[in-house]
């Protein structure tokens, strides 16, 4: 007989969803309040108010005390509305007492005890005191101390039908303070200050109430204490720095102890040299890479099918190695550290969770700096005086007045005589394309009178004269100008232009 298996309850399904199981949308939305009805209540709840109609998502029992029908009250003790009576006295508002200014000319009589004094020993009808006049009783009210406050408040009670009743309770006014003065008692107190009798009271100051006339007796004696600046402090360095550019020791030790030397980080010393050059070879088997950069963080991804043991047992299950950190220890060694993470637990989503391990390797000791004592090379027992005649000469250099020095113009005259005998005169003549257009006449050993015109400056060399003019042969070739026109008077049809082929080179 086949029986249908009962489906799990919505509560069990939602608990399974929270633990990572399958989440059914309708069950999840019901428990998290994301159904359509919940959305409508959230949207229209701010627009429409149904507070007095009892509409809600509760059990429908009317709250903790149930529903109360409209109209006449139900069974039970009938309720009676009590009138609210207004208190007869003025109720002071709660809060701090008002600040009353103090008059400096007022009497400074402050009672020593709180409350009313005991005046039972002196009755008003007892008659005058023995051996004195009548006793007068005064009531003193001080505005600075007699500040009214709330002495009590109304007592509020409630009955079974939750009706509030207010009981009229009036606070008791505070009793006025009374002081008894007896004119027969006259006590005089004298104070004698004599520094010769009592040398310890040289700096006694007598202060009198400012409402009466008084004098200040005594001098101000004080001790002169030299003040020193607190920001300038001298201290001695206990040990010399071990680095050329040392940083603050406090920040370095605090950051190192917080990150690497925490109680939640395991400490693992390493002695393999590959930890400095290529630490990935200690985690997984691989070849030596000459282009490996050791100053980076390393992430290792492993497949469960190809899981292998690490080359070094200390690096088993390591999935992350941080960048190297160089520091110095208290023993004076240089330490290279890397912060790693082991994959101790892997969830179904692929998240790896594991402890952190501090891998470190101590390289070498930092030798202390040798202090070399410097000796004096030469010690002169007495003062020596050296006199030099060259240093005794004083020379003044005045560059400002050196421009006005008089010079002789004969210094500018050239003493070398130039001779142009057996000279060769070459006259080059070329066009714009550097082609020779005019024949060069070679005038060798021909005395000529050559004139050179250069603008407004004309120089004539009269050392050479033409002896025989028949030596100059004139050319019979007629000289005609040559015009070169470089332009075209037509346009070629585009169809006659050769087609350009595109050749792609790979």
From Swiss-Prot:
The keyword Disulfide bond applies. A motif (Nuclear localization signal) lies at residues 1-8, 498-503. Disulfide bonds join 17-23. It is found in: Virion; Host nucleus; Host early endosome; Host Golgi apparatus. Its main location: virion. The keyword Disulfide bond applies. Highly phosphorylated. One of its GO terms (cellular component) is viral capsid. Pfam families: Late_protein_L2 (PF00513). GO terms for biological process: microtubule-dependent intracellular transport of viral material towards nucleus; symbiont entry into host cell; viral penetration into host nucleus. One of its GO terms (molecular function) is structural molecule activity. Keywords: Capsid protein, Cytoplasmic inwards viral transport, Disulfide bond, DNA-binding, Host endosome, Host Golgi apparatus, Host nucleus, Host-virus interaction, Late protein, Microtubular inwards viral transport, Phosphoprotein, Viral penetration into host nucleus, Virion, Virus entry into host cell. Interacts with major capsid protein L1. Interacts with E2; this interaction inhibits E2 transcriptional activity but not the DNA replication function E2. Interacts with host GADD45GIP1. Interacts with host HSPA8; this interaction is required for L2 nuclear translocation. Interacts with host importins KPNB2 and KPNB3. Forms a complex with importin alpha2-beta1 heterodimers via interaction with the importin alpha2 adapter. Interacts with host DYNLT1; this interaction is essential for virus intracellular transport during entry. Belongs to the papillomaviridae L2 protein family. Minor protein of the capsid that localizes along the inner surface of the virion, within the central cavities beneath the L1 pentamers. Plays a role in capsid stabilization through interaction with the major capsid protein L1. Once the virion enters the host cell, L2 escorts the genomic DNA into the nucleus by promoting escape from the endosomal compartments and traffic through the host Golgi network. This is Minor capsid protein L2. It comes from Human papillomavirus type 50.
């Amino acid at each position: 007989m086949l029986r249908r298996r009962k489906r799990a309850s919505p509560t069990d399904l939602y608990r399974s969803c929270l633990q990572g199981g399958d989440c059914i949308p309708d069950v999840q939305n019901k428990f998290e309040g994301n159904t359509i009805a919940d959305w409508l209540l959230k949207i229209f709840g701010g627009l429409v108010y149904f507070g007095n109609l009892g509409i809600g998502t509760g059990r429908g029992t009317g709250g903790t005390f149930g529903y109360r029908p409209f109209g006449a009250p139900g069974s039970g003790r009938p309720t009676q509305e009590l009138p609210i009576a207004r208190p007869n006295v003025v109720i002071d508002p709660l809060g701090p007492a008002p600040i009353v200014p103090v008059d400096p000319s007022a009497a400074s009589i402050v009672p020593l005890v709180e409350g009313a004094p005991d005046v039972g020993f002196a009755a008003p009808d007892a008659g005058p005191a023995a051996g004195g006049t009548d006793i007068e009783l005064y009531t003193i009210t001080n505005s600075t101390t007699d500040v009214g406050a709330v002495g009590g408040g109304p007592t509020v009670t409630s009955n079974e039908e939750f009706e509030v009743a207010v009981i009229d309770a009036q606070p008791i006014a505070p009793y006025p303070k009374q002081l008894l003065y007896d004119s027969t008692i006259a006590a005089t107190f004298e104070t004698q200050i004599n520094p010769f009798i009592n040398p310890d009271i040289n700096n006694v100051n007598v202060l009198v109430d400012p409402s009466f006339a008084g004098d200040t007796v005594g001098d101000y004696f004080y001790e002169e204490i030299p003040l020193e600046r607190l920001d300038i402090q001298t201290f001695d360095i206990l040990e010399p720095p071990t680095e050329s550019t040392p940083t603050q020791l406090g920040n370095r030790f605090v950051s190192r102890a917080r990150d690497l030397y925490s109680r939640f980080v395991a400490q693992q010393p390493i002695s393999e040299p590959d930890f400095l050059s290529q630490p990935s070879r200690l985690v997984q088997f691989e070849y030596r890479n000459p282009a490996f950069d050791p100053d980076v963080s390393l992430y290792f991804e492993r497949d469960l099918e190809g899981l292998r043991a690490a080359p070094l047992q200390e690096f088993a299950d390591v999935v992350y190695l941080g960048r190297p950190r160089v520091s110095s220890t208290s023993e004076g060694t240089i330490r290279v550290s890397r912060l790693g993470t082991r994959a101790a637990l892997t969830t179904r989503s692929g998240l790896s969770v594991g402890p952190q391990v501090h891998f470190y390797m101590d390289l070498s000791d930092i030798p202390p700096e040798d202090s070399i004592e410097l000796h004096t090379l030469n010690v002169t027992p007495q003062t020596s005086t050296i006199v030099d005649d060259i240093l005794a000469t004083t020379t003044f250099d005045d560059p400002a007045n050196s421009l006005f020095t008089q010079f002789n113009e004969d210094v500018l005259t050239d003493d070398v005589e130039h001779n142009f005998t057996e000279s060769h005169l070459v006259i080059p003549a070329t066009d714009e394309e550097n082609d020779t257009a005019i024949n060069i006449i070679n005038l060798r050993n021909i005395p000529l009178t050559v004139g050179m015109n250069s603008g407004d400056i004309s120089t004539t060399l009269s050392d050479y004269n033409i002896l025989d003019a028949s030596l100059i042969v004139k050319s019979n070739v007629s000289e005609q100008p040559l015009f070169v026109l470089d332009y075209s008077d037509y346009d070629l049809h585009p169809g006659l232009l050769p087609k350009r082929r595109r050749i792609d080179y790979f």
